[in-house]
């Protein structure tokens, strides 16, 4: 058995979600310090046991009932004992980038032409259920940082986002040429759709932003409908301006006649 730890704590940065303490040998005098923004989970033989909130804890078997029960069966309550401690960062971690790896193919809902569209942006995540996250994603890995967590979610995130892009445009009758004006609503709709998928792994999707849309600029069919779309609104604006001008002229002529 190696060195027996006296104090266990984690002072890492804010880009790490989970960190496993390198020391795995403890006794009844070992102190566990959990900061205000953290939780700690004890593992023995691959089983998640007691969870500790913020504060200073002594790892006495009488204070850790799940650990105590296992130790009494396996070591007759003798110390020191061998287990693992994982620290979980509970803060909201922001500016985590995401993006579709390819463009989604669907029928543009307003003008009904085939369209390829990709998206990218940022999201913020927070650990919602430490035990679930450890059991479903972390496993025996010593660290779970932003990059690794984003990589875990990349596959289903790409699939969901591509599907939800088309659904949002169809449900809200928003054309591809108007989507920029609805970016906030679009982002919030995607967040609501994606949140349950993250929660399944013990992670809260706190914020989700679409900041960029990858359109098929330069593609002949896309450019044709783009020109038609903006020409339509230009013609409407021109007609309204002409109507206002004619009204002003009529009012002016009427004023002259009355004079």
Label the model's feature ranges.
Residues 4-133:
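Hydrophobic membrane-anchoring helix/hairpin
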